[in-house]
Each structure stands twice: as structure tokens, then as C-alpha cells.
Amino acid sequence: MKKAVILFNLGGPDKIENVEPFLFNLFNDPAILNLPTILRYPLAKLISNRRAPVAKKIYKELGGSSPILKLTMAQSKALETKLNQTEIDSEYKCFIVMRCWNPRANDVIKDVQSFNPEEIILMPLYPQYSAATSGSSIKEWRDVCKKNNYHVKTNTICCYPTDQNFINAHTKEIIKKIKDLKNFKLIFSAHGLPEKNIKKGDPYQWQVEQSVKKIVENLNIENLDWILSYQSRVGPLKWIGPSTEDIIVENSKLAKHIVLVPIAFVSEHSETLVELDIEYKEIADANGCKNYTRVPALGTNEDFIKAMSELIIKKNEYKFSENLYPPKIQCPSNFKKCPCLNYE
């Protein structure tokens, strides 16, 4: 039986000239700017044009392009191998769909049709669900399938914030970095979100908190000094906090060894390689930090690949509703943006 796995990620510009078009795609997404097209399009043009110079400097730090596609391809290859080794009576093929740059859903659907699967599994590379990330990617894929009159049995793994293999992957990476440390502050850093999104029922912050809670329990370190914070704030809106930058400043002044964990990113990209590794380290150094360590994103970590593989193969064990498979976790009823509570 042929099965196609669609891996969703954000994407990133493949050269400096594509930074502004990438930003436009990001801000032209209704899940990011919830405005009518007639207003959203020109505003996305304006924002992307104004932010392009700073963003270009960031990508120049990375050699002129984002590494996210190459790294996602490595994850895709590892997952495809694991799936085919584990479930030998099925033929799995993984396809990458980026939301804001290539490869886009409109192009990838042609490759999926050529593969001619009997089943499609949608797997966001976002462990914690947000309408702005997983939700947007899933909707785009469904819209493209509808536009192309493509109807195949499709199942969705909406999120996996407390999956044990995912938790184990983070735990092991953290232990590698802290096993010989003393007087350190473990800072779990996730991408921020405007407070208004959470108030409208987005479960992202709650799910991030559940991930961190499980990892801390799994570490099982007495009197562990840890905190969850949020990075990458932009614009005038009030964002969820506390901010990672503020926490770094505070603990640098206390002469703590800073240990950063990117809890919501599973691939290295500008927010980890530049924001965490360069910009925040400079802030830490300027405030007296003597030691600064960053735990890597999970990438092709064996436990993370196992997590995705088992989520796909064993999905019927935690089936919530027709074609929707959350991993043994249900968001509280006030999070109306959660697909488990608002399933079509």
C-alpha cells in the first residue's frame, strides 16, 4: 500500500534576492495578517519591503540563504527510511511542503499525484499546534487538493507536544549540554505569538507549556533552575512573555551559565543560528555572562525521527475523530482554534 507523508515547514529564502518575496509570502498569509485580500496584499508588500534590509543582513550571516530546506530534506530522508524499515508491507514516500517558499503545495501536489498513494498523512514539523503555522499549512494543502480535484484518503497528525519520544529527544540533547555544569539557568525558548491570538483560542502557548513540563519531569533533576520564555517579537502588538532577551539579561547579571533550548523549532534556521547563537549571545556577553550554551534543534535526532514514525504508523491508537489524530492530548475547551475542538 502506497502512503505519502507530507512534511510541513515554513521555508526560507534560497538566495538574498528572494528575502523580500519570502517575507511577502509570510505576511500575505491570512493566518498572519487576518485582513481582506484588498487590504492584506498592499500591507504585506509594505511590511516585507521595510523588513527586507534587516532580514538580508540576517541571511548574510548564514551565507546568503536559509539552511532550512536542506535540513528538512535530511529529516524527510531519515523519516522515510525509518517508516519503510518499520512497516514493510507499506511503501512510504515523504514530500516536503514549505508554506512561504519553495517547494510550495501547488508544485508538490503534482509529485504526490505521480506517486499515486492510497493514503496521505499530513505531518507538520511544528510539535505544538498554532493556527498560524500548522493550521495555515494544513488549510493550504486542503485548498490545493480541492482546487486540483484531488481526493485521496487523508489523515492529519495535528500536533505532538507531549509525545514521549519527542520528550526523550529533547531530554537527551539537554543532558549532553548540562551534565558537567553548575550554577546554570535552563531557558526554554519558543517563538512568540501576539497575546490576541491566544485570547482568540490558539492553543500554542498551552501546548508549549505542556512540552516543557514533560521535559522537566523527564530530566528529573532536583532543584532545576529553569524558565520558559518567548523570542522573535516584532511589531507594536503585545506578545506573550516573558521575553527570552529579558531573561538572558537578568540571569547574565546574576553570573548564571546560560543554557538555551529551542523548544518549538525542530530545524536550525535564522531564529536559532542568528537570533539565539549570535544576537542573544552578544546581549548575554554585554551583561556579564561568562558562559553561554545553546542546545541544538532536534534535526535528525534518532528519538525525534522515531517520534514521527510512530505517530504515523500507530496513529489509530490515539484517533480522536475521523481523519484527525492528536497524540493522546486534548486542549482545554477554551482553545477553540485547536482542530480537535473545531474539526470540520
Swiss-Prot record:
GO process annotations (BP): heme biosynthetic process
Q: Where in the cell is it found?
A: Cytoplasm
- The record's top EC class is lyase
SS bond list: none
Asked if the keyword Iron belongs to this entry, the reply reads yes
List the catalytic activities from the record.
heme b + 2 H(+) = protoporphyrin IX + Fe(2+)
Q: What is its main location?
A: cytoplasm
CDD domains per the UniProt record, alphabetical: Ferrochelatase_C, Ferrochelatase_N
> Lyase: present as a keyword of the record?
yes
**What PROSITE patterns does the entry give?**
FERROCHELATASE
Q: Which Pfam families match?
A: Ferrochelatase (PF00762)
| InterPro entries cross-referenced by the UniProt entry | Ferrochelatase (IPR001015), Ferrochelatase_AS (IPR019772), Ferrochelatase_C (IPR033644), Ferrochelatase_N (IPR033659)
Single GO cellular component term: cytoplasm
Q: Check the record and name the SUPFAM superfamilies matching this protein.
A: Chelatase
Query: What EC number(s) does its UniProt record assign?
Result: 4.98.1.1
Identify a single GO molecular function assigned to this protein.
metal ion binding
> Per its UniProt record, what HAMAP family does this chain match?
Ferrochelatase (MF_00323)
The entry sums up its family as follows: Belongs to the ferrochelatase family.
Q: What protein name is recorded for this chain? A: Ferrochelatase
| The species this protein was found in | Pelagibacter ubique (strain HTCC1062)
The gene coding this protein: hemH
